[in-house]
Amino acid sequence: MLLIKNNPFRILGISLFDSEKEIQKKITKITRFTEVGKEVSFDLDLVKLFEIDRNLENINNSKRKIEKPLTKVLHSLFWFYQSNHVDEIGFENLSNGDIDKTIQIWEKVVKDREVTTKNFSTLSNLKTLYYIKYNVNGFDKDSFTRYLELTGKFFSNEEFEKYSKKIINSDNTNITNFEITKTFIDQILLEIKPFIDKENGITYSEIINSLNFFSTELNDYVSFKTTSTPTNNIEVRINETSE
C-alpha cells in the first residue's frame, strides 16, 4: 500500500500531467512550507483514507521517483486524476473515505461501456481504487481479480499510449508499452506472493485467468514467470528503477 500512501504525485501535490515548470513550482512551495514547519494540503490528499507525511525526506524521495520517465509512468499507475464530472463526483465521496460508494459511481461509467477519451480517466481511477480495496483489509480476491481486469483494459486501450506520453511530457520516448506492463506486473506478483496458494488467497491459475485483457505477450510472460520460478524470485522493479 506504500505505492499509494507515499505516491510521489500525492506527496508532491502534483497532477499526473503537470508540466515540468508546474512540478518545480509545487515542489518549491511544499519544501519551503515544510522547512518552516507549515502544513500544506491539496485536493487529492485523501487523508480520510491514509495519513500523509510531507517531511523533507519524503519530498526528496518523491522528487527522485519521477525523475526517470519509466518510474514516473509506473507511479502514475497507482494514483488518480480528474478529467470529467463523474471523476469529480467520485472524488467527493473518496475524500470522505467512502471507497464502496465511489466504486459504485465509477463502475456505472466503465462497466460494459466502450472506453473512450472521455471516460478513460474513470477507468484509470477505478482500477487504482480496486488496488486499494483489495489491500485495505488484508487480501480480497474478488477485488484483486477485478483490479487486474480493469488494468488490462487500461493498458490495452489505444488511449494508454497517449496517456504515457502525456505523463512523460514528450512524444519522444524509447519506453515501450510492454516494458511498462512487464514492470508493473512484476510489482503486483511480488505483492501478492504471500497470498499464493493460501487459505482466502489466490492461485497463479486464477491470476492468469484474470489477464484476458492484457496482451498475449504479457500473458506469455506471466505464464513463464509463474511456472518457471516456483520460488517466486521476482524483482522489485519499480523501486529499483527509481534509484
Regions found by a protein language model. Name each.
Residues 62-72:
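Long, intrinsically disordered, low-complexity Ser/Thr/Pro-rich regulatory/activation regions
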Residues 1-48, 58, 71-74:
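N-terminal J-domain/J-like co-chaperone modules of DnaJ/Hsp40 proteins
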Residues 24-31, 58, 62, 82-243:
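Amphipathic alpha-helical protein-interaction segments
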Residues 9-12, 49-52, 72-85, 89-91:
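Conserved "turn/edge" positions that cap or connect secondary-structure elements
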Residues 41-42, 77-78, 117:
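Residue-level detector of alpha-helical recognition elements and their boundaries
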